[in-house]
Amino acid sequence: MTIGFNADLYILPFDHRGSFQTKMFGWTGTLTPEQTAQIAAAKQVIYEGLKAAVSSGVPQEKAGILVDEQFGAAILRDAAKEEFMTACPAEKSAQDEFDFEFGKDFAEHIEKFNPTFCKVLVRYNPEGDRALNQRQTARLKLLSDFLHDNSRSLLMFELLVPAEKEQLERLKGDKNAYDLEIRPRLMVQAIQELQDGGVEADVWKIEGLDRTEDCEKIVATAHQGGRDKVGCIILGRGEDPQKVRQWMETAARVTGFIGFAVGRTVFWDPLIVWRSQRITRDAAVAEIGERYRSFVDIFENARHWRKKSA
């Protein structure tokens, strides 16, 4: 069984479901068909932004989308036809414990679209609830085994390590101190525990890190035990562009980081302005494309520095 994906990977993620519904549109509860169509139409604008970026020079073979089946089925089909890399989430939206969106039918829904990547978002703090971590690991192993034994789709693992209450209390509530001093170590430990539990990610989707040495430790852990082809990408976490740029430049200079997945920082503001009718749809598409392309340029320029200094 070959594990890993190590080609360039520049993902525009817009698989947000619960947060998109409530924070972008202000809707709660069961959606009407008309509301569902409005969300799908907004996601189409994001997708067209990616296409615009490719038309303006982003290499298509490096570009990919991450979008959900609920609001993006048509986008997933079109992107596959257009030969973009695609990713589709398997997790239930907006809950702390990982479980499958479609329960025992998860495999059927993966095979329905055959995305390049099946993505999971998992909150896993090694110093948190041990029983919860074990339950999550057992479900994730089911998915990992299915993908590697029976599917063409690869496993993209988005690892979030939120601070436990006690951890923050030790730092007097300083979340920045947690991100800098505590989270990197816990991320390494989480990857090790998941690997030991039989979860084999092809790509680790990682929260931003401020220090090069922490990026290097993540890659070393992802690669251990003969997993040399496993890739790592940086996620944006909805931060401001300057912070995302800092994380991206730090990661790009470390061999083993193959790209990024930046979503809200790219599309959120243009969609808000478009929905308030302050700009046209075409202008929103263009702005999303320009923002996405700017992050491609940032990553590639930083990586060029790495190669130049090697």
Residues covered by each model-derived region:
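Alpha/beta catalytic barrel-like cores
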Residues: 1-132, 200, 230, 242-251, ...
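Alpha-helical scaffolding segments of alpha/beta enzyme cores, especially the outer helices
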Residues: 45, 108, 138-149, 189-193, ...
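Catalytic beta/alpha-barrel core
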Residues: 65-68, 116-123, 129-135, 179-186, ...
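Short beta-strand/loop segments at the ligand-binding rim of alpha/beta enzyme cores
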Residues: 83-86, 150-155, 225-240
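Active-site-adjacent beta->alpha loops and helix N-cap segments on the catalytic face
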Residues: 98, 126-146, 208-224, 242-243
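Conserved anion-binding
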Residues: 137-193, 197
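Active-site pocket-lining/capping segments in soluble small-molecule metabolic enzymes
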Residues: 179-189, 235-240, 244, 249-252, ...
